[in-house]
Each structure stands twice: as structure tokens, then as C-alpha cells.
UniProtKB/Swiss-Prot annotation:
Intrachain disulfide bonds: C42-C45
GO cellular component: extracellular region; lysosome
Compartments (UniProt record): Secreted; Lysosome
Known glycosylation sites: N80, N207
Signal peptide: 1-26
Native source organism of the sequence: Arabidopsis thaliana
Keyword Disulfide bond attributed: yes
Record keyword Repressor present: no
Protein name (Swiss-Prot/TrEMBL): Gamma-interferon-responsive lysosomal thiol protein
UniProt entry keywords in alphabetical sequence: Disulfide bond, Glycoprotein, Lysosome, Secreted, Signal
Similarity section: Belongs to the GILT family.
Amino acid sequence: MVSSSLTKLVFFGCLLLLTFTDNLVAGKSGKVKLNLYYESLCPGCQEFIVDDLGKIFDYDLYTITDLKLFPFGNAELSDNLTVTCQHGEEECKLNALEACALRTWPDQKSQYSFIRCVESDTKGWESCVKNSGREKAINDCYNGDLSRKLILGYATKTKNLKPPHEYVPWVTLNGKPLDDSVQSTDDLVAQICNAYKGKTTLPKVCNSSASMSKSPERKWKLQVSYANKATNY
């Protein structure tokens, strides 16, 4: 028998389809679907967002990439749809705040700029809101019912991952999780360049992959947060 929690989750997922319309695989534009499933207080997520994800914009890869962020991570959902976050209540609040920000801006550059601001200093998130130019819209969403609906939508997306995520940050390219060969930002850049099938001219960085591989690179040593594991705060 399907649990009441799952039934309710499916209902909310259907209810929010218009809000979260997004194909996991490459669309007609040929853009690479880059999805990041994360939680706001996961150390590895913070490092990846601040230090690595920015290269998508530094290298103009956003022109061939459809970047989507899903701030739910390893949170748990009870039968009455209560959300319990891995790193405590503060993480739930920041996840909801970031969900509202993602809703507020239509373009991925503005979305990333705000998320990066928060993840760079999670205790100073209020200044990110005040300096965003969208303070009222974000606060109205965060303080109203919409933030909860958005989080439930992200819960649906995260829980329906196939294969299921094992930890966060969890990154997928065109619906498939990164394999073990991707161990640095350069590796991720190369994967994006190779996955692009559209007609837009490739960013210069895609034509310099050979020289990139010869230069020293920072191997990822991310402090990931595993699913179904308790975290001591």
C-alpha cells in the first residue's frame, strides 16, 4: 500500500508542475541540463557553489547550459509533510529562502549570484536579501505559503531522482549523475563541452580543453553529506 506521505507528495508534485516545468534531459535547444541537488548548510555544497559552479559563468558556459538548483538535499518529509533538514532548522529556513530567490529571478545568472552570496556567508544572508534589489518579492515569498509549496516541489524532484541521490552535492548532466571520472572543475567543464549538441558557438574554454588539462588543477575534496545519515550539530 502506498504511504500517505508518498500520496501527498505526488499530489503536491502534480499541483506544482507549472511552477517547476523542467526537462531533465537535453531540450530542443541542445543546451546541457546541469542540475545541482544540494542543501544550504552542507559544507561540500557551499564549497561547490562558491568555488566551482561560478566557472559556468566565468567561462561563458551558461550560454550552452541550462542550470537548475534544487535546495532540498537530504531533508526528510514526514507523513504530514513536515520537513526535517539534515543540518537543523536553520538549514530549512535557508533552503526556503533560496527557493524563493530561485522563483524570484527568471535568469540563471541572477539566481546564481544570490545563491552564491548566501552560501559564501550563511550567517550574513540578510545582507544578500537587502542588496538583491528584490527584497520585497523574496520576503513576501519566504513569509507566505509559497515558500513551503516551493520546498515541497523540490522535495518531489529530489525524491524522484533515478538513480536516487547518495549524497549532496549531487550533480547531474542531462539527467545522469556525474561519474567517478569527474574529479575537478576542469573535468566538469570538459563534460559540459562534450555534452552540448546545439548550434550556438561553443565558448572559448571548450576549445582550450587540451591546454586546461596540462595546467595544475584543484582536485575536488568536497565534504559531502550522505543521505540517510544523522549529522551532529
